[in-house]
């Protein structure tokens, strides 16, 4: 408070000084100007003071004044026979818009430069307190569900209603009447005048959209904070989550949630996607996967405007009808199935809904017009949210038994619910949000089925053009019998109705006097963003495309590679690695730059269409482009889908630099990255309208890894087939199959070190002839001593590395790089897939699975060793 008081005093002082300086300059100017009134200044001598100053010349009458005199006009009197004409000049018009002269509505908002708003009627705060409604008793939950299972008698159908001013069961008549009257005043104002008054009057207006694509994103940020982060499920204990999204510009972000499970959310009726852009930004990197469902067409998601995060972690769906209509029963069923498939049957952690449509000219009955939208959004949450998951949804007025009945049923389905209007929701509208915490599947399933039946009934009445409507979802007396709920819902409605009335009156005052503006807007913006833990910055115009350096990074793979690699090498050295894996060619370095995806082939980078390779910017991977194989008995068919992009190793995952982590940790992060990019449906739609088309992009998956101790498990996933006399070995990876071309054995420690097994400690250790002073280093010290082989050590073999490795091999220092065990058949020898799979010992000095397993068993027996050396089936 003292800082703000100091700021006010400083501002007042500056204003006072400015006024004084202005007056001094004006006086000086007038004094100097007096000497330039004549071309030749009058010479002043001592005698001039004795003469009287000549009177100014008489002003000549204008033609208009002469005409007025002839009509009998005299100064101070009016025209007319009885001098009844007006004497004062005609006043400036206070008329607004095109409303007729004298219209009562026009008079109510007529211009008045003396109009002043009383700030004391407002309560401007940064922090907000949300109120959770009293939880419903478990016994009542069961009673209601039992009633809904038996029949649909609670569903009341009668003649539709198009007025709201008599809905006083859940709000006092006075508050409702005052609010409606305040709304009616603006019917005579143009949209332009109303928007202009709102911009100056709303104390939180300048918060805007910050660096997101629209204001909806900031609503989510606002709600996330005041509900103690239950929406994004951020762990805010020690503020470590801020490392993912630093508040200070220029600070490097750190993925502290790399080891957390993937966060799933759904964004329903929320185009163009501000909710989702915030959630992907807040979770950061590849920690979240979103599903979107909204109307197709002009109100669709604007994925190209996702600049705070990558839209590749967001998958859209439009239902069976492909129109995104959430009120269509078939679309709801297909969305439920889609989300189940995309989340392995679990559902999303969070559903967000922001549905609405224009009710121009019918603002007072917005609740009645939106009742089915209310129903379907809340119904979808019961279909797709997982056990214990959360949900929030935009509502408007809730005065009717239908709306209040819906809210009551949400209390049955969730542990707790809350109704709240955040600061970022403009105060003069009836918008508010229902937030539901902790879904209870036991009860939600029953209510879901009931609401689906209600929606089908509404659909039936609509298709028949019936004048009837579903007016109640549960008896009014059942709701009223819950006295605590009635008290809370009435209090909520009256508080919001009063606040809305106050701000409608403020808009009216600011519309009258256009010189008024809310002086707290700038200060509130800064303090709110700080409180919500959102950086105070603006959205860049044109994104990075307005910057030459940004363009280089978005289009040049070498620029991205140079940001992260610790090795200096030429392009020719990138290909010196190892032979093919699941494909016929070498494994390839893939780099995502933002505007393009590049793969290193044949000694140079080749660009892939980014619509088909959905890889976000700042990504560096070692990949195997493999064809998926379909089988029909003994027949083998290559899938017609584009090649799979299989991750064999990872350096950078959407800006998360994992290159220095141990190989197993890198691959675990890559698995999460691939899961976030996974498409539930193989095809996606790009464009809309007549430009819309369906495409099948490359699927991204992570190659499965095994240690040599897991050869039995690996072998169980192999399928041996004969085709045209040739043995072909397929390996299963999830629900897919690939040809086994070779195995990649990855070195997990740096080239300088050799691994051993401590019999006394029963743990691995390393030692090195080149670092004898270091002695033996046990496994728990490897990370601290940087023993693990990095991505760059494994993938990029520079000429200097080759020379060092050759010298080590010459001195018998066991220089074994990451290598490939080829399984391809050879025309000159019988060695191939069949011998590798079935021969009981080494064949012609070459390894087989049985020979390796025997060697491992012997080593285990002598050292009691239990693990290590991962291999990848590729």
From Swiss-Prot:
S-adenosyl-L-methionine binds at residues 273, 354. The active site is at residue 394. Residues 1-64, 535-555 are annotated as: Disordered. Residues 60-106 form the G-patch domain. GO terms for cellular component: cytoplasm; nucleus. Residues 211-440 form the RrmJ-type SAM-dependent 2'-O-MTase domain. It holds the Pfam family G-patch. It catalyses: a 5'-end (N(7)-methyl 5'-triphosphoguanosine)-ribonucleoside in mRNA + S-adenosyl-L-methionine = a 5'-end (N(7)-methyl 5'-triphosphoguanosine)-(2'-O-methyl-ribonucleoside) in mRNA + S-adenosyl-L-homocysteine + H(+). It comes from the Eukaryota. One of its GO terms (biological process) is 7-methylguanosine mRNA capping. Keywords: Methyltransferase, mRNA capping, mRNA processing, S-adenosyl-L-methionine, Transferase. The keyword Iron-sulfur does not apply. Its EC number is 2.1.1.57. One of its GO terms (molecular function) is nucleic acid binding. Residues 1-10 have a biased composition (Basic and acidic residues). InterPro entries: G_patch_dom (IPR000467), mRNA_Cap_2O-Ribose_MeTrfase (IPR050851), RNA_MeTrfase_FtsJ_dom (IPR002877), RrmJ-type_MeTrfase (IPR025816), SAM-dependent_MTases_sf (IPR029063). PROSITE patterns: G_PATCH (PS50174), SAM_MT_RRMJ (PS51613). It is an enzyme of class 2 (transferase). S-adenosyl-L-methionine-dependent methyltransferase that mediates mRNA cap1 2'-O-ribose methylation to the 5'-cap structure of mRNAs. Methylates the ribose of the first nucleotide of a m(7)GpppG-capped mRNA to produce m(7)GpppNmp (cap1). Cap1 modification is linked to higher levels of translation. This is Cap-specific mRNA (nucleoside-2'-O-)-methyltransferase 1A. It comes from Caenorhabditis briggsae.
């Amino acid at each position: 408070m003292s800082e703000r008081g100091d700021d006010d005093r400083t501002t007042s002082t500056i204003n006072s000084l400015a006024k004084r300086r202005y007056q001094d300059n004006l006086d000086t100017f007038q004094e100097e100007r007096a000497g330039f009134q004549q071309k030749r200044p009058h010479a002043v001598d001592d005698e001039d003071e004795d003469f009287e100053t000549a009177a100014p010349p008489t002003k000549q009458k204008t033609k208009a004044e002469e005409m007025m005199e002839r009509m009998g006009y005299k100064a101070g009197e009016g025209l007319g026979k009885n001098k009844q004409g007006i004497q004062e000049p005609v006043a400036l018009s206070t008329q607004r818009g095109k409303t007729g002269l004298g219209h009562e509505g026009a008079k109510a908002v007529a211009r008045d430069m003396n109009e002043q708003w009383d700030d004391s009627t407002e309560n401007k705060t940064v922090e907000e307190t949300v109120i959770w409604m009293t939880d419903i008793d478990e016994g009542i939950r069961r009673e209601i569900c039992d009633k809904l299972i038996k029949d649909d008698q609670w569903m009341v159908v009668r003649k539709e209603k198009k007025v709201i001013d008599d809905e006083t069961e859940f709000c006092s008549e006075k508050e409702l009447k005052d609010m409606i009257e305040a709304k009616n005043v603006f019917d005579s104002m143009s949209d332009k005048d109303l928007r202009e008054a709102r911009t100056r009057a709303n104390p939180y207006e300048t918060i805007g959209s910050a660096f997101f694509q629209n204001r909806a994103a900031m609503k989510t940020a606002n709600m996330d904070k005041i509900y103690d982060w239950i929406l994004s499920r951020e762990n805010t204990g020690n503020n470590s989550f801020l490392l993912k999204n630093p508040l200070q510009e220029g600070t490097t972000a750190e993925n502290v949630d790399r080891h957390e499970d993937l966060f799933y959310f759904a964004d329903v009726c929320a185009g163009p996607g501000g909710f989702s852009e915030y959630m992907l930004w807040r979770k950061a990197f590849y920690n979240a996967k979103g599903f979107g469902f909204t109307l197709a067409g002009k109100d669709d998601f604007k994925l190209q405007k996702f600049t705070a995060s990558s839209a590749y972690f967001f998958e859209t769906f439009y239902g069976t009808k492909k129109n995104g209509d959430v009120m269509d029963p078939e679309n709801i069923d297909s969305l439920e199935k889609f989300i189940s498939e995309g989340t392995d049957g679990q559902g999303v952690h969070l559903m967000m809904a922001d549905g609405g449509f224009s009710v121009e000219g019918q603002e007072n009955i917005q609740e009645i017009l939106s009742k089915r939208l209310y129903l379907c959004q809340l119904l979808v949450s019961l279909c797709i949210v997982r056990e214990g998951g959360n949900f929030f949804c935009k509502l408007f007025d809730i005065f009717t038994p239908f709306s209040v009945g819906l809210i009551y049923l949400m209390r049955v389905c969730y542990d707790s619910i809350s109704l709240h209007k955040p600061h970022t929701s403009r105060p003069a509208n009836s918008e508010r949000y229902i937030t539901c915490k902790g879904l209870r599947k036991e009860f939600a399933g029953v209510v879901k089925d009931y609401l689906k039946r209600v929606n089908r009934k509404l659909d039936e009445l609509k298709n028949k053009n019936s004048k009837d409507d579903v007016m109640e979802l549960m008896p009014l007396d059942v709701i009223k019998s819950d006295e605590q709920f009635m008290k809370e819902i009435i209090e909520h409605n009256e508080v919001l109705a009063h606040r809305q009335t106050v701000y409608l009156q403020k808009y009216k005052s600011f519309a009258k006097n256009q010189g008024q503006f809310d002086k707290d807007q700038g200060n509130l913006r800064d303090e709110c963003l700080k409180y919500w833990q959102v950086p105070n910055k603006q959205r860049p115009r044109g994104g990075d495309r307005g910057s030459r350096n940004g363009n280089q990074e978005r289009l040049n793979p070498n620029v991205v590679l140079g940001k992260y690699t610790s090795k200096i090498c030429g392009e020719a050295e990138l290909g010196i690695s190892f032979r093919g894996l699941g494909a016929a060619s070498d494994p390839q370095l893939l780099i995502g730059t933002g505007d393009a995806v590049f793969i290193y082939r044949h000694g140079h980078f080749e660009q892939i269409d980014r619509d088909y390779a959905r890889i976000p910017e700042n990504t560096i991977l070692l990949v195997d482009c493999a064809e998926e194989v379909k089988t029909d008995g003994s027949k083998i068919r290559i899938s017609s889908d584009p090649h799979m992009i299989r991750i064999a190793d990872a350096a950078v995952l959407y800006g998360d630099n994992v290159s220095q982590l141990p190989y197993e940790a890198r691959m675990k992060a890559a698995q999460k990255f691939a899961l976030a990019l996974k498409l539930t449906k193989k095809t996606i739609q790009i464009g809309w309208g007549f430009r819309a088309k369906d495409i099948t992009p490359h699927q991204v998956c992570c190659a499965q890894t095994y240690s040599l101790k897991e050869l039995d498990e690996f072998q169980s996933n192999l399928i041996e087939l004969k085709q045209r006399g040739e043995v072909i070995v397929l390996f299963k990876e999830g629900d897919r199959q690939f040809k086994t071309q070779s195995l990649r054995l990855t070195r997990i420690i740096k080239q300088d070190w050799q691994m051993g097994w401590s019999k006394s400690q029963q743990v691995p250790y390393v030692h090195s002839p080149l670092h004898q002073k270091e002695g033996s280093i046990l496994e728990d010290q490897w990370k601290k001593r940087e023993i693990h082989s990095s991505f760059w050590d494994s993938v990029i073999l520079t000429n200097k590395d080759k020379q060092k490795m050759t010298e080590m091999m010459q001195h018998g220092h066991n220089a074994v790089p990451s290598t490939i065990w080829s399984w391809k058949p050879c025309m000159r020898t019988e060695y191939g897939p069949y011998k590798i799979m079935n021969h009981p010992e080494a064949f012609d000095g070459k390894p087989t699975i049985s020979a390796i397993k025997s060697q491992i068993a012997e080593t285990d027996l002598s050292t009691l060793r239990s693990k290590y050396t991962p291999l990848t089936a590729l």
